[in-house]
Amino acid sequence: MTKYIFVTGGVVSSLGKGITAASLGRLLKNRGLNVTIQKFDPYINVDPGTMSPYQHGEVFVTDDGAETDLDLGHYERFIDINLNKYSNVTTGKIYSAVIRKERRGDYLGGTVQVIPHITNEIKERVFRAGRETNADVVITEIGGTVGDIESLPFLEAIRQIKSDVGRENVMYIHCTLVPYIKAAGEMKTKPTQHSVKELRSLGIQPNVIVVRTEMPMPQEMKEKIALFCDIDPKAVIEARDADTLYAVPLMLQEQKLDQIVCEHLRLNCREADMTEWKALVEKVRNLSKTTKIALVGKYVELPDAYISVVEALRHAGYAFDTDIDIQWINAEHVTRDNVADLLKDADGILVPGGFGDRGVEGKIEAIRYAREQRVPFLGICLGMQLASIEFARHVVGLSGAHSSEFDPNTPHPIIDLLPEQKDVEDLGGTLRLGLYPCKLQEGTLAYAAYGDEVIYERHRHRYEFNNQYRPIMEEHGFVFSGTSPDGRLVEVIELKDHPWFVAAQFHPEFTSRPTRPQPLFREFVRASLKE
C-alpha cells in the first residue's frame, strides 16, 4: 500500500517547505524506500513557463519536458531521482482538465463543482504519482500558505484522502515560523498556534509540526506548541537556519523525523545510512580553495532565477575542494568601456539562459572579453547563441549578425527559429523541451568532459544555430563539437584557440547532483582554478 505525506505551510511563505520535503525524501530513500515527490501550486497559470523569473524564480525542466517549479530542482538534487510532468500540478492544470472533461460530456450533464469534481481531479494527481512510479511513499508539497483562498481546494482534497486510503496511510506535516522578537528578546509561538488552528478548521490535524526559527527552541516551548496543537512533543521539529542546505536532512534525522514518519505510517524499514551525506556536508563546511565565477545575467537581483546554475557550480566546486564565489554581474550594465573593469577579477565567466533582448549586448561584450582575454567560459542556451553571434561579428566579420529573435531584419541571422516553430503562435508549452540526445565529436573539450560519444541533456529553446553559417564559422576556428544525432541541430560549440571556451544549447545545470557534478560544470570549474 502506497503511503502519502502532505507538507503544508503556515504563517508566511518561503519557510523552506520544499527543502523540508526534499530532506525527508532523502532520509526515506536512504531507509531503502522507493520515494516520489510532487509540488502542487495554487496559481491559475497552467505552468510557470511563461512567468517572469522575478515572479517565480527559475523554471525547472524535467526529462519529459515539463516546465515546473524550482522546488523540483531541490527534490531532484536531494533525493537523486528524475521527476516527470506528474510532479508539478497547478490550479490551471486542474481546471483545464476538468473543463476539457465537461466539454467532452464526461460528467453526463451534471453540475460541475469544486467539490467533488475539482477535488477528485486533485486526488487523482496524487494517486497517479504513486502509480506511475510504484512508490512506497508519495510526498506532496502544497504551495502557498494555509489561509490563502487559492489553496482551499487542494487542502480539501488532501483532507479527503485520509478517508479514502485510511489514516494509517496518510501523514500531515505542517511547516510554520516561530519569530524572534529582538526588542523583547523573546520567541513567539502564537503565529504557529493560529496557523494550526486555521488548518484544523479545514479538517486537517497535523501529525508533525516543523518550526523554522533563528534561535534554539527551549524544550518548554516545544511542549507548549504540542499542547496547543494537540501533537506529541517529539513531533515538534526544530528547523533552525543552516549554514548549508545539505545539512538540513541531518538536522531532521537528529530529531528522528524519519523515525516518527515510519512509525506513524507503519513502515518497517532499516535505519537511514547517511554516511555519504555526512561526508558531503563535512566537505562543504571545510572547503580550502576559492574561485571567482562571474555570472552575467539579466535577473541577478533574484538569485532564485539561476538557482540550478548556482547549485551546479557549487557541486563542481565540491569536487575540487573549492568554494565558488559568484560575482553577480547585471548584463544591462556591461558595456565595451567597462567590461574589463567589471570582469577583471573573474577566474571564469558564465552566461546563462534567458529570453528577451534586455541585456543581450552586455552579455555579448562579456563573451567577447572571455574570448579575447582567454578566460574560461561556459555559455548555456542563450549564452551559446550569443557566443555564436559574438564570434560571427568580431572574428568572422559579419557586421550586424544577430538572432532573428531580437532583430528580425538582421542581414546575418546566425540564430533563427527552429523550422518546426515557424507556425507556432502560443508561447506556453511550445518550446523544444525535455531530454534529447546529443552526439559529441571526439577530440573536443565537450567529449573530454563527458567521455562518451552520445549524451542526453534537457532543453528549453525555440531558436537554434542557423546551419547556413556553419562552413564560414568553421573556417575561422569555431568548433561544432556536439550536434543532434542526425547532425541537423547544433548542440555544443567551442573555440580552437582558447584554453576552455564551451557553450551548449541545452541546460546542463538541471542534471547536476551534489555528489555527482555535471561534466561541463566540473571541467569549467577545473579550468577556472588554473591548475
Curated annotation (Swiss-Prot):
ATP binds at S14, L15, G16, K17, G18, I19, D71, R240, D241, A242. Residues 292-531 form the Glutamine amidotransferase type-1 domain. CTP binds at S13, D148, I149, E150, K188, T189, K190, P191, T192, Q193, K224. L-glutamine binds at Y54, G354, L382, G383, M384, Q385, E405, R462. The gene is pyrG. Pathway: Pyrimidine metabolism; CTP biosynthesis via de novo pathway; CTP from UDP: step 2/2. Belongs to the CTP synthase family. HAMAP family: PyrG (MF_01227). Its EC number is 6.3.4.2. It catalyses: UTP + L-glutamine + ATP + H2O = CTP + L-glutamate + ADP + phosphate + 2 H(+); L-glutamine + H2O = L-glutamate + NH4(+); UTP + NH4(+) + ATP = CTP + ADP + phosphate + 2 H(+). Catalyzes the ATP-dependent amination of UTP to CTP with either L-glutamine or ammonia as the source of nitrogen. Regulates intracellular CTP levels through interactions with the four ribonucleotide triphosphates. The keyword ATP-binding applies. GO terms for biological process: 'de novo' CTP biosynthetic process; pyrimidine nucleobase biosynthetic process. This is CTP synthase.
